[in-house]
Curated annotation (Swiss-Prot):
Subcellular location(s) of the protein: Secreted; Target cell membrane
Protein name: Oxyopinin-4a
GO biological process, one term: hemolysis in another organism
Species whose genome carries this gene: Oxyopes takobius
Propeptide: 21-47
Record keywords, A-Z: Antibiotic, Antimicrobial, Cytolysis, Disulfide bond, Hemolysis, Membrane, Secreted, Signal, Target cell membrane, Target membrane, Toxin
Keyword Translocase: no
Length: 77
């Protein structure tokens, strides 16, 4: 009898893990689409960043945002 209870527990655990992984992938895809849509709306003034003219702030901002988004996607935020 104990073997069947363990089997049922493992079976239900596998189903719940598979369901959680599927929901997680859908959510991460949605978030990455939102990040892509919102990137162009962010300006240095909006974020409170004041860049010296020698930094070429626009290019710097884009590099920082690309790195940030890549890190967030890797860690599946």
């Amino acid at each position: 009898m104990k073997i069947s209870q363990v089997f049922i527990f493992v079976f239900l655990l596998m189903i719940s893990v598979a369901w959680a992984n599927e929901a997680y992938e859908e959510e991460s895809n949605y978030l990455s689409e939102r990040f892509d849509a919102d990137v162009e709306e962010i300006t240095p003034e909006f974020r409170g960043i004041r860049c010296p003219k020698s930094w070429k702030c626009k290019a710097f901002k884009q590099r920082v945002l690309k790195r940030l988004l890549a890190m967030l996607r890797q860690h599946a935020f």
